[in-house]
């Protein structure tokens, strides 16, 4: 183990501390290869639910198709992703990259002023936002040129019935979702169409 890589001691047994990558292979090529080789293995987990590589590929392709076909986004358009580390994030980032979009990462803890600057500076016209942060966008929405808002909830990709219970608990019991008014917003669950 290298002393300049102290995190390596936390790697699972058999995990190399260095990967040789071909600079001509894209992130999507790597994802497709991983899906082909590890289809049923867990790619991501959150709150006790998992997504296999096969599921990530399917969901990211569905999301990419939605962005292109339903929202009309084109290669080079920018999409802001304002989410914590939840399973929707890798689906959204891989879907956006599959669609040829430029991803603008936005801290879900940003203040309205910080969010406004990030969106204006990046030129993003679409945002996928965690419901718990939607009130921040609502505060500055009229000052931005956002055309599409996609809202995701904590439980959107969790297993049934855990996802439903989690959404109810977060919003109504723990009251962790401040009120917001974004009437034209699209719900992430509605973007999951068969391709």
Residue spans of the language-model regions?
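Ligand-binding pocket scaffold of soluble enzyme catalytic domains
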Residues: 20-23, 33, 101
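Structural core segment of the AMP-binding/adenylate-forming
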Residues: 98-192
């Amino acid at each position: 183990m290298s002393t300049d890589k102290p995190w390596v001691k936390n790697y699972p047994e058999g995990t190399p501390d260095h990967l040789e990558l071909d600079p001509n292979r894209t992130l999507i090529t790597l994802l497709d290869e991983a899906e082909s080789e590890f289809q049923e293995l867990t790619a991501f987990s959150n709150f006790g639910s998992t997504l296999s590589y096969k599921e990530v590929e399917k969901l990211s392709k569905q999301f990419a198709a939605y962005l292109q076909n339903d929202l009309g986004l084109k290669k080079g358009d920018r999409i802001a992703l304002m989410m914590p580390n939840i399973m929707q994030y890798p689906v959204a980032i891989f879907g956006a990259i599959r669609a040829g979009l430029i991803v603008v990462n936005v801290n879900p803890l940003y203040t309205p002023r910080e969010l406004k600057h990030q969106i204006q500076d990046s030129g993003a016209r679409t945002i996928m936002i965690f419901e718990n942060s939607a009130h921040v966008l609502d505060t500055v929405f009229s000052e931005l040129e956002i055309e599409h808002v996609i809202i995701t909830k904590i439980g959107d990709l969790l297993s049934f019935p855990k996802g439903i219970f989690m959404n109810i608990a977060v919003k109504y019991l723990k009251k962790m979702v401040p009120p917001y008014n974004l009437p034209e917003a699209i719900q992430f669950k509605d973007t999951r169409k068969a391709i």
